[in-house]
Amino acid sequence: MAKKEVAKIKLQIPAGAANPSPPVGPALGQHGLNIMAFCKEFNAKTMEQKGMITPVVITVYADRSFSFITKTPPASVLLIKAAKLEKGSGEPNRNKVGSVTMAQVEEIAALKMPDLTAKDLEAAKRNILGTARSMGIEVK
């Protein structure tokens, strides 16, 4: 018989750097999970992506056990890394803060493909281009 799901918790945590402090501790603690066990498992699984913001969906079961799925980093984080920026523009329609090449956009779209609802790579590229536009990043 399958375990009974009690809750799903969605968090964005830096890869390889989960610790019991907020937001991880309070989110898991209210469901009675072993916070350190999650932190150790998450850090071991994401060690090769160290520093990247990694979305994670934690499924909590009735017996206080858990499982989790890591997703690809948000497109905005990947674009900021590709453009070598600190953050996006506060006024994207007026101030362009950086630029990325179409090849970089294609690379990001290919990486994000499993988590996007896009049917093909072209649709995924359009999705990434829209994110870049809303952040004030120019595509060349």
UniProtKB/Swiss-Prot annotation:
InterPro entries, alphabetized: Ribosomal_uL11, Ribosomal_uL11_bac-typ, Ribosomal_uL11_C, Ribosomal_uL11_C_sf, Ribosomal_uL11_N, Ribosomal_uL11_N_sf
GO MF entry, a single one: structural constituent of ribosome
Keywords attached to this entry: Methylation, Ribonucleoprotein, Ribosomal protein, RNA-binding, rRNA-binding
GO CC aspect terms: cytosolic large ribosomal subunit
Protein biosynthesis among keywords: no
SMART domains noted in UniProt: RL11
Subunit organization: Part of the ribosomal stalk of the 50S ribosomal subunit. Interacts with L10 and the large rRNA to form the base of the stalk. L10 forms an elongated spine to which L12 dimers bind in a sequential fashion forming a multimeric L10(L12)X complex.
Name assigned to this protein: Large ribosomal subunit protein uL11
Naturally occurring in which organism (per UniProt): Nitratidesulfovibrio vulgaris (strain ATCC 29579 / DSM 644 / CCUG 34227 / NCIMB 8303 / VKM B-1760 / Hildenborough) (Desulfovibrio vulgaris)
